[in-house]
């Protein structure tokens, strides 16, 4: 028993010293300031996996669910100009954290009549 402990301790210490082998690094939050993005229902328009209809934005070609404001705070999602029916433009600020957009501001821009 004592000999096996003497063997295991140096092996574990060696593994812990290998950079990137044991501990994964988390990505720092990506800051978004006053950027015009696409906004829509994540499930209906951006085909994200989820339950029900939830607000999402597409930033630089990638869609993220939104925290800090909800789909129902911006009108009827199922109206002709709603998030489930069309993709809208919004001016946003916030940060991307753990694959979600944390909105500090979200301004829905006027509907032009065309889906983006």
Predicted regions located by residue number:
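Bacterial N-terminal signal peptides that target proteins for export
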Residues: 1-9
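Bacterial N-terminal signal peptides
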Residues: 8-19
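Boundary at the C-terminal end of the N-terminal hydrophobic targeting segment
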Residues: 22-26
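Structural detector for short beta-strands of small beta-barrel domains
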Residues: 29-53, 58
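Short, isolated positions in well-ordered beta-strands
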Residues: 64-65
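Short nucleic-acid-contacting surface segments enriched for D/E, G, S/T with interspersed K/R
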Residues: 75-91
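OB-fold/S1-family single-stranded nucleic acid-binding modules
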Residues: 97-116
